[in-house]
């Protein structure tokens, strides 16, 4: 091919020639950048790069919240110089040390998660533009601030699909730059990897926001709807008498064609369609903006994937992308369940039938000639999957295929157990399977049944069993009654928080009279089973916190009922309000949680969003009480979501397994010089309480996590009523779950007597006098002296010197 050069040509003498100009590479982004620069009000970081947030914001966070590194091993195996032993402060052959290497390891996981969401967004955006055109409006509900994460990063406020493209290009460009820093001989400083990880986290929330806003607009999902329909959830909701199509993954694009085919052929009441992971959440949002009676169902999280397959219930399985088990094809093949791969990111080595005739492909799959196929043509996919499900069901019913053992087989397998303990050692949850098998030998299967909810369905136990006992099948066999009764309700993902809801709650959140926002997100790698997140959500809802949920957390909360048979979604309203349980949607909907905090700053406080991340994050860190919970986090996406919250000043608590991410961000509360900010009115330094005391940490139990999260909602700007409310909750929860007296550092958060919980104010004043030496005026019941922090209702705390008036 000849090299293109600059020049010109004339069309003056040409006849009957049509010249078509399609996309000009980079033109949309260049035009967007020029448009953003013309903004009258804009912050300093429009279209930021790797260095943009480093000195102005990230290093300020990392100075207070120091990285705590938890290596998985002492070696680095990145290049052919290695493996290198980095223990004992040694450096590798390339010069990197343990801190730098582990900073890179954590950073790599964050950019992997960011790339996953960004690629999801790119796939949806391109497909939806091709299907609906660039002019399709972003109708997301009654809001003017539609895309706060996009706006913060780029200054753009897209109003249709086409206007989203520059933001998508920006994320992809920066991801390339970030990935380059992982190469050997690039970055080696742990703190700079942390800064880059924070930047990548901010990009992740842009990628997620793109993914969700385009699908909400195009697929007619609920639009900021607090009354979104309730959806059936659980394995027990599946009608086994009907053909069953099971969809797994996170990208709902292809599933919408299956649902359209069902509706066009009047099959919605003749077969079941249900899903696992976030595809399940999003298929139940499809065309639900008008609250039509839903027919799609949710089975549950990734932890249920192998359990559902082993049950033999699905007649066809369709996978798209993300959080899909790598052994689905061999597991499904044992039970003659065809597997259809509908996304190029997961193809499982299956034959590609995208260009083949649908009838021929159905015959291949029915006969078992192929275990499954790749189908990337969505029109064909819709027809193929529905027709195949209807035709496979009678074939599989006639054969009676299932992996669940008979009673006789169960007894034989249990008797084979040698009590060697290999399964216990292999289990990531440390389930005492040998003990349960011992009781089963005596005829007591209740211990095995008790493992059902805690088991994450990984089958590591089966792979180490020398007797080749199908342990997962045994657990599922003895839990058949429990599975049949596994029926709950989950509110369909409602989409973003509306501007009106922010206006109604913004003041309460900033003043502290609404105790805080608790965001329960993430994966199912729980240490003690799914009910942990139910307990946590219920406790905070009872105390009038706003509880927002997404993804697996949103599903698992809906699995359990109270004594009256009601789930939390039935007991609490779906609005963004005190005591509201707000299911935002799937994993990509997490962007609306950070978006809500950003909108508090933009709508309530009138702060500029455009290119202004540091100021918005500074506002959130000092004023908006919020804490995330990723109790079962396992994936790279969970790390990128959490890190995107961290750069915005939102702390997150992770479950006990999450130390394997290799890094936490925890402040030293005793270093008083780290707990000073500027008063924006005059630029003077002012002390603040150690709140929040971490940005990223882990807890061992849900009982430990609850008071930790309540404390993490305390903010320097709380007024006295808000501070008293927050102290009440934190201190009560500490006593309830950790036992004994008040937390040892409660007094650090008291600025005057009005900050003290009203119910036991006098008793606490006595403690302050006796234990801390504070001077109390007992006639007026006022604190005369003692607090190091004085309350000033008009103070304007900021970490950014440039925001002070004198600056």
Swiss-Prot record:
Entry EC number(s):
1.2.7.4
Q: Name one GO molecular function term.
A: iron ion binding
Q: Which domain of life is it from?
A: Archaea
What is this enzyme's catalytic activity, as reactions? CO + 2 oxidized [2Fe-2S]-[ferredoxin] + H2O = 2 reduced [2Fe-2S]-[ferredoxin] + CO2 + 2 H(+)
Single GO BP term: response to hydrogen peroxide
Record: residues binding CO: 117
Residue positions binding [4Fe-4S] cluster 3: 417, 420, 423, 465
- Matching PROSITE patterns: 4FE4S_FER_1, 4FE4S_FER_2
Pathway assigned in UniProt: One-carbon metabolism; methanogenesis from acetate
Q: Which residues take part in binding [Ni-4Fe-4S] cluster?
A: 250, 278, 323, 523, 552, 587
Q: Which InterPro entries does the UniProt entry name for this protein?
A: 4Fe4S_Fe-S-bd, 4Fe4S_Fe_S_CS, CdhA, HCP/CODH, Prismane-like_a/b-sand, Prismane-like_sf
Keywords, ordered alphabetically: 4Fe-4S, Iron, Iron-sulfur, Metal-binding, Methanogenesis, Nickel, Oxidoreductase, Repeat
Q: How is the cofactor bound?
A: Binds 7 [4Fe-4S] clusters per heterotetramer. Binds 2 [Ni-4Fe-4S] clusters per heterotetramer.
Query: Where is [4Fe-4S] cluster 4 bound in this sequence?
Result: 427, 455, 458, 461
Names of the cofactor(s): [4Fe-4S] cluster; [Ni-4Fe-4S] cluster
Supply the enzyme class, top level: oxidoreductase
Residues that bind [4Fe-4S] cluster 2, according to the entry?
A: 76, 79, 84, 94
Main role? Part of the ACDS complex that catalyzes the reversible cleavage of acetyl-CoA, allowing growth on acetate as sole source of carbon and energy. The alpha-epsilon subcomponent functions as a carbon monoxide dehydrogenase.
Q: How does it assemble?
A: Heterotetramer of two alpha and two epsilon subunits. The ACDS complex is made up of alpha, epsilon, beta, gamma and delta subunits with a probable stoichiometry of (alpha(2)epsilon(2))(4)-beta(8)-(gamma(1)delta(1))(8).
Under the heading NCBIfam families, the entry gives: cdhA
Domain-level remarks: Cluster B is an all-cysteinyl-liganded 4Fe-4S cluster; cluster C is a mixed Ni-Fe-S cluster which is the active site of CO oxidation. Cluster D is also an all-cysteinyl-liganded 4Fe-4S cluster that bridges the two subunits of the CODH dimer. Contains two additional 4Fe-4S clusters, dubbed E and F, that probably transport electrons from ferredoxin to the B cluster.
The text of the family note is: Belongs to the Ni-containing carbon monoxide dehydrogenase family.
* Protein name listed in UniProt: Acetyl-CoA decarbonylase/synthase complex subunit alpha 2
